[in-house]
Amino acid sequence: MNAALSQWKDAHAARLRDYSAVRVSGRVSAVRGILLECKIPAAKVGDLCEVSKADGSFLLAEIVGFTQECTLLSALGAPDGIQVGAPIRPLGIAHRIGVDDSLLGCVLDGFGRPLLGDCLGAFAGPDDRRETLPVIADALPPTQRPRITNALPTGVRAIDSAILLGEGQRVGLFAGAGCGKTTLMAELARNMGCDVIVFGLIGERGRELREFLDHELDETLRRRSVLVCATSDRSSMERARAAFTATAIAEAFRARGQKVLLLLDSLTRFARAQREIGIASGEPLGRGGLPPSVYTLLPRLVERAGMSENGSITALYTVLIEQDSMNDPVADEVRSLLDGHIVLSRKLAERGHYPAIDVSASISRILSNVTGREHQRANNRLRQLLAAYKQVEMLLRLGEYQAGADPVTDCAVQLNDDINEFLRQDLREPVPLQETLDGLLRLTSRLPE
C-alpha cells in the first residue's frame, strides 16, 4: 500500500513540476504548402501543436525550425481549412508512442493512430498514462550491439543457400514493379519464426493495401503483427513519419526481449516523401535531385534496427529500382548502409522463375558469421557456376558456343537447368535449412576441382 502511494505521489509530483498556469499559444501568419508560419515563445523543434481549422476541428503540426521572425511548423495532414490567424496550441510534447501487446493485430496510420482493429493505437497524446517512447530517436551506441551470430532461415532455397540471413541483420530487397516483391515479403514474415512482425507500408495504393491484408496475412500471422500504413494519398509528413513509427514500435518490442522482424516497404517512397518536405522547407537539391535531409535521415532510420542486449530487430527494407538499374541514388545510398541486399530480377520474373532472386547480384555481408566453411565453399562454387554461365549465355543463344575450352564453363552449361530448378520454389512450401544445404552440396559437388 505504501509503495503504491509513493509511486502515485512521485508520478503526480512530476506532473506538477511540469505544470504551468500560463498557456502559451500563437496564431498562423502564413501558409506555404505544408509549412505554417507563426510565433510561439519558448518553442522547441520536434514539439507537436494543435492548429484550429475553420470548421472547429484540429490539425496536428510539428515544429521543424525557426527564422528570426517566426516559428516554422510542418502540417501532419492536409492543411485544408487553415486560415491566417488560426489559433495554435502547443502540446508541449514530441511525437511519442505507447506500445503493449494490445497493438498486435492492429492496423495503424503513419502516426500510430488506429485504422483497423479494436485497439487504443500507439499515438500518445499529452494525457496518455502509458509508458511511452519517442518516435524520432537515436540508434543504440555501437558498443551496445552484440555480434550477429545466429542464422535466421527463411525457408526460401535461393536465400538460405547463397544469402543466409542472420538474426539482427538489416537487408535491402531491391526490386522493380511486378517482380513478386510483396509475395516474397509475406512469405518471409510467415517463415522466419520471429515473435513479432512489424510492417511499415509507405506510399502503397489503397487497393493493394486491402488486398495485402485480406490475402497475404492469415489469421495466425495477423495475431503477431502490427501494420503501420500511410497510403500514397496521405501527406508527405505522414508517409515519412510512418517509417519512424514502425521502427519505434519494433524497438519497443525488442526492449522487451523479443525477436522482431521489421518489414518496411519502401525506403524509396520514404525518400520521396522526405524530398517533398525538404523542398517545402527550402532545402537545396543535391545529388540525384534529393535534398540533404534524405541522406541524413536514411542512416538515422536504418541504424535503429539490429541486435541489442535484450532482443533483436531483423529488418528488411524494400527499394524500388527501374529497369533493373542499381544506379538510382536512393538504391546506391541504401546499398552502402545495409548489411546485405537481395535483388529481384525482372528477366527472371518474365521467364516465370519465382522467386525471381538474382543470386549472383545478391550478397550478405555477415554470411561468414552464420555459416560453416562447408556452406561457404558450396556457396562460392554456386556463384562460380552462375558467373561462368552468364559469360557464355549470349553465345549459347546464338548457337556459337563450343564446348571443351573451359571445364568450369562446360559444367555450368550442363548444370544450368538443375541450378534453376534448385533456385525455383513454390513459396507456400518452405524448405528446411538442412535440406537446402544438402541440395546445395549435391549440386556443387559436380563442379570439377
Curated annotation (Swiss-Prot):
Gene Ontology CC annotations of this record: cytoplasm; type III protein secretion system complex
Predominant cellular place of this UniProt entry's protein: cytoplasm
Record-level GO BP terms: protein secretion by the type III secretion system
Example GO molecular function: ATP binding
Activity regulation, per record: Oligomerization increases ATPase activity.
Residues annotated to bind ATP: G178, C179, G180, K181, T182, T183
Pfam families according to UniProt: ATP-synt_ab (PF00006), ATP-synt_ab_N (PF02874), T3SS_ATPase_C (PF18269)
Disulphide bridges: none
InterPro entries: AAA+_ATPase (IPR003593), ATPase_a/bsu_AS (IPR020003), ATPase_alpha/beta_chains (IPR050053), ATPase_F1/V1/A1_a/bsu_N (IPR004100), ATPase_F1/V1/A1_a/bsu_nucl-bd (IPR000194), ATPase_T3SS_FliI/YscN (IPR005714), P-loop_NTPase (IPR027417), T3SS_ATPase_C (IPR040627)
Location relative to the cell: Cytoplasm
Function: ATPase component of the type III secretion system (T3SS), also called injectisome, which is used to inject bacterial effector proteins into eukaryotic host cells. Acts as a molecular motor to provide the energy that is required for the export of proteins. Required for type III secretion apparatus (T3SA) formation, proper protein secretion, host cell invasion and virulence. May play a critical role in T3SS substrate recognition, disassembly of the effector/chaperone complex and unfolding of the effector in an ATP-dependent manner prior to secretion.
Protein name: Type 3 secretion system ATPase
PANTHER family: ATP SYNTHASE (PTHR15184), SPI-1 TYPE 3 SECRETION SYSTEM ATPASE (PTHR15184:SF9)
EC number(s) recorded for this UniProt protein: 7.4.2.8
SUPFAM superfamilies for this protein: P-loop containing nucleoside triphosphate hydrolases
UniProtKB keywords: ATP-binding, Cytoplasm, Nucleotide-binding, Protein transport, Translocase, Transport, Virulence
Catalysis performed (reactions): ATP + H2O + cellular proteinSide 1 = ADP + phosphate + cellular proteinSide 2
Lineage: Bacteria, Pseudomonadati, Pseudomonadota, Gammaproteobacteria, Pseudomonadales
The protein's assembly and partners: The core secretion machinery of the T3SS is composed of approximately 20 different proteins, including cytoplasmic components, a base, an export apparatus and a needle. This subunit is part of the cytosolic complex. Forms homododecamers. Comprises two hexameric rings that are probably stacked face-to-face by the association of their C-terminal domains. Also present as monomer and homohexamer in solution.
